[in-house]
Amino acid sequence: VHWTAEEKALVNVVWSKTDHQAVVANALGRLFVVYPWTKRYFAGDSAVQTHAGKVVSALTLAYNHIDDVKPHKHYEGFHVDPENFRLLANCLNVELGHTLHKEFTPELHAAWNKFSNVVVDALSKGYH
């Protein structure tokens, strides 16, 4: 994936202006409301908070290696449908829009969406 300097700067804006743990936890909550079948992977609220931390770690790793995001296999024992990564990315985009309000410009949204698609593709490739 080719990143322009502007796209990288826009992804950095999102990353630097948000409380990662809170945004991801809220996005997971939104995921469970909009796509209730995804909740089956979690035993309770503490599992959700723990998973939010894991998602933040994965996003941080991808952010730190934005030019070379590697495929990663999600926990085998959970048998997670890779499409759920895309659903979570969509919910994360909504949560970022809610959090950043007017700062979540179309350009910022496009750059973040490109980043989240790269991450989702890397996670999904871990299954093939």
Curated annotation (Swiss-Prot):
Red blood cells (at protein level). Gene3D superfamilies: Globins (1.10.490.10). One of its GO terms (biological process) is hydrogen peroxide catabolic process. It comes from the Eukaryota. SUPFAM superfamilies: Globin-like. Heme b binds at residues 51, 74. PROSITE patterns: GLOBIN. PANTHER family: HEMOGLOBIN FAMILY MEMBER (PTHR11442), HEMOGLOBIN SUBUNIT BETA-1 (PTHR11442:SF100). Involved in oxygen transport from gills to the various peripheral tissues. Belongs to the globin family. This fish has three hemoglobins: Hb 1, Hb 2 and Hb 3. They all have a similar Bohr effect. Hb 1 is a heterotetramer of two alpha and two beta-1 chains. This is Hemoglobin subunit beta-1. It comes from Somniosus microcephalus (Greenland sleeper shark).
